[in-house]
A protein has these predicted regions:
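Short helix- or helix-capping micro-motifs
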Residues: 5-8, 115-126, 144, 151, ...
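Extracytosolic helix-loop segments that constitute the early lumenal/periplasmic catalytic or substrate-binding loops
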Residues: 10-23, 30-57, 64, 71-72, ...
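Loop-to-helix entry region of an early transmembrane alpha helix in multi-pass inner-membrane enzymes
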Residues: 59, 63-67, 77-100, 119, ...
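Membrane-interface anchor segments at the N-terminal boundary of transmembrane helices
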Residues: 86, 93, 284, 290-291, ...
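Transmembrane-helix motifs of polytopic, lipid-linked glycan transferases
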Residues: 86-110, 148, 340-347
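Membrane-interface transmembrane helices that cradle and orient dolichyl/undecaprenyl
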Residues: 109-113, 141, 149-167, 171, ...
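Transmembrane-embedded, aromatic-rich helix segments that form part
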Residues: 166-167, 180-196, 237
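Membrane-proximal stem/loop segments at transmembrane-domain junctions that anchor or position
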Residues: 227, 233-309
Length: 408
């Protein structure tokens, strides 16, 4: 499974490399903000300048992936074929490795048959193939860490080894440095673990404190760096209110309308340049809160649309939107089918005596996307949930076939 998954993604990477060599907007498609920050690191200016001009230190993104891209640039020479292929190869490796936790997660919660089918399904999973081989971004690494986190959380339910808690804390710390949104389910999963281990008569408080200390030790250097750079407590990143502003500004022509982001709006970019990063983020907070207070109905309506978009891929049938997004309708059918199969698989498992095993995964499915409902949603943002979705999609199909055969 692993080698097939890797080969498919590497083949797509080889085809997609020319896309990243386009000099449009100074190689903007080469990692977007992450590519700009990586170049700044290589040029000796540090973790800075996420947009088009030098703008000083930034905390708009977490550090792990930009430094990874910077390492590739340092080795292979900036925006080159070799650099693009190196980054895409790493993406492909991360995505292919995700087969392993997918297999063991399915085996632990469901059964061996589902684990094998889910592993092979992941090898050919379109979103994973595209996000690994068709984008220079952190999606594949984020998904790998997420799937390892989900698996390690389940292992802790009955584990007596302190080392498992250390690994858990380290994984959460790594998640914070790669994609802080992964930390969303942490308090809910921690409560679930405390309840489950208490029922089993197993210790949870001190091992949990130790895991929390490991997490803090992993992210602390980055938090200290942010405080020194901005004289403000910024634990991991500072872009939350900008993302809220993008989602709630009155423009629903797209999930992320061009009029609301500094990379696509001359007005927003001019404000960024004038105020600096911290001033800009403060301004977006003020603007977003004011707009939401003045338009509560709009906030509720767009939030509902974000929920629908997260689980079906659907946003709009406006001709101008569809012209810019030619795969929107096919993707909507595919994403909706995946969600329906997910619901079916969860139902089969829950009613089939696996409710306790399934519950923490349901908890993740509910809590992880919450931040995207109140900012803006996207299929790539949902990618950390895709291992769980693929597992239960496969289980739904297999269980339906088994029951149909039993009735025949």
């Amino acid at each position: 499974m692993f080698f097939v998954a890797l080969a498919i993604r590497l083949a797509v990477s080889a085809v997609m490399v020319p896309e990243f060599l386009d000099p449009y907007r100074d190689h903007w498609h080469f990692g977007w903000e992450m590519g700009r920050i990586a170049r700044s690191i290589v040029e000796g200016h540090g973790f800075a300048s996420p947009f088009f001009d030098p703008s000083g230190p930034t905390a708009m993104l977490p550090p792990a992936y930009p430094y990874l891209v910077a390492a590739c640039m340092k080795l292979f020479g900036g925006f080159t074929v070799a650099t693009a292929m190196a980054v895409l190869t790493l993406n492909s490796l991360f995505a292919a490795l995700t087969v392993i936790p997918v297999y063991y997660l399915a085996k632990r919660v469901l059964d061996e048959r589902t684990a094998l089918v889910a592993g092979w399904a992941w090898a050919f999973f379109p979103y994973s193939i595209y996000l690994a081989g068709g984008r220079i971004y952190s999606d594949a690494l984020t998904c790998l860490i997420a799937s390892l986190l989900w698996l390690q959380t389940l292992r802790l339910e009955r584990s007596r080894r302190l080392s498992d808690w250390l690994v858990w804390g380290a994984l959460w710390g790594a998640a914070g440095l790669v994609s802080p949104v992964l930390l969303g389910p942490l308090p809910f999963l921690a409560i679930w673990l405390a309840v489950r281990r208490s029922r089993e008569g197993l210790a949870w408080l001190w091992p949990g404190v130790l895991a929390a200390c490991v997490l803090l030790a992993v992210v602390a250097p980055w938090t200290v760096r942010n405080y020194r750079a901005f004289d403000r407590f910024i634990p991991l990143r500072d872009g939350f209110w900008m993302e809220v502003h993008v989602g709630y500004n009155g423009d629903t022509s797209d999930v992320t309308p061009d009029s609301a982001h500094p990379t696509t709006s001359a007005i927003e970019y001019a404000q960024w340049r004038r105020l600096g990063e911290i001033g800009f983020m403060d301004a977006k907070k003020t603007e977003a809160i004011h707009y939401i207070r003045q338009h509560p109905g709009f906030f509720a309506w767009v939030t509902a649309r974000h929920v629908v978009n997260m689980w079906t891929g659907f946003w709009s049938l406006a001709p101008t939107f569809l012209a810019d997004e030619p795969f929107h309708i096919p993707n909507t059918f595919f994403a909706t089918a995946m969600t329906l199969l997910l619901i079916g698989g969860l139902r089969y498992a829950w009613l089939g005596g696996k409710a306790e095993a399934v519950f923490p995964l349901v908890l993740i499915l509910i809590t992880f996307p919450l931040v995207y409902y109140i900012t803006h949603s996207s299929m790539d943002y949902r990618h950390p949930l895709d291992p769980i979705i693929v597992i239960f999609d496969c289980y739904c199909v297999l269980e339906w076939r088994r029951r149909r055969a039993a009735r025949a």
